[in-house]
Amino acid sequence: MFSSVKSKVIHVEPVIYDLVLEPFKVHILGCGSALPTLKHSASAQIIEMRGKCFMMDCGEGAQMQFRRTHVHFAKINAIFISHLHGDHCFGLLGLLSTLGMLGRTAKLKVYAPESYGDLFKRQIDFFMQGMEYEIEFVPVDTEKAQVVYEDHSVTVETIPLQHRVPCCGYIFREKPTLPHIRRDMIDYYEIPVSQINNIKNGADWTTKEGDVIPNARLVMPAVSPRSYAYCSDTRFVPGLAEKVKRSEEHTSELQSP
């Protein structure tokens, strides 16, 4: 369903450029309800974007689904938990243990409702003795929309939801990138490499003859950033549709009355 993103081709005269987008994939490892079925595993997803790999919820059976989708355990950069019902988090400790047995050394952050903090620490202290990587618990205020993760290319923002327990969704967003340089214009006007970043950031270019070349002639617009919204179990939330409508894709799990 969300397994791949096609390259977008932008035509600029007189040269044709093919701008290949970085992969943006969502792997649905599980989408079943609280009761197990033979067709669907419990809730778990992997979001691949900008060279990173984020896990969204971790129900039972997630590790087996990793194997089936050929996503490598070692690629996980961070784990996000929407709420503390078992079908969304009972697979977490097993996965963390497996990562340790596979020799992970990189630090891993787990974002989850703040009420899980004390229990999570006790579970890690009891079950994860001797593991050679650090696990950091990051408490999430499920009642507040806020950016909980940010790096140079991606942000993750919470979406307050309404469920029987504290619960939030997450929006994974790409950050805008700089415009793309037109190589034919750079060559034609003999612009030195040292000026490329200035031009990407909006500078015009003045030729040896004193002519000012507008920036718009030297660059192509950047590809629009993409986003993905994950809304787990929730009742009707006024304004929720407005918050996620700008996302290219989204997943929602609705709670029956």
Locate the predicted segments by residue.
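Generic structural signal for residues in well-ordered beta-strands
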Residues: 26, 135-137, 156
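Structured loop/turn residues at beta-strand edges in well-structured enzyme cores
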Residues: 71-74, 133, 152-154, 245
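Short "domain-exit" segments at the C-terminal end of structured domains
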Residues: 253-257
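Active-site metal-binding motif and surrounding structural segment of the metallo-beta-lactamase
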Residues: 60-111, 139-141
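Conserved beta-strand hairpin/beta-sheet module of binuclear metal-dependent hydrolase folds
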Residues: 12-69, 105-107, 170-172, 221-230
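Active-site neighborhood of divalent metal-dependent phosphoester bond hydrolases
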Residues: 104-108, 113-141
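Metal-dependent phosphodiesterase/nuclease catalytic metal-binding core
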Residues: 2, 6-7, 12, 16-20, ...
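Active-site metal-binding loops of divalent metal-dependent hydrolases
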Residues: 31-32, 61, 84, 115, ...
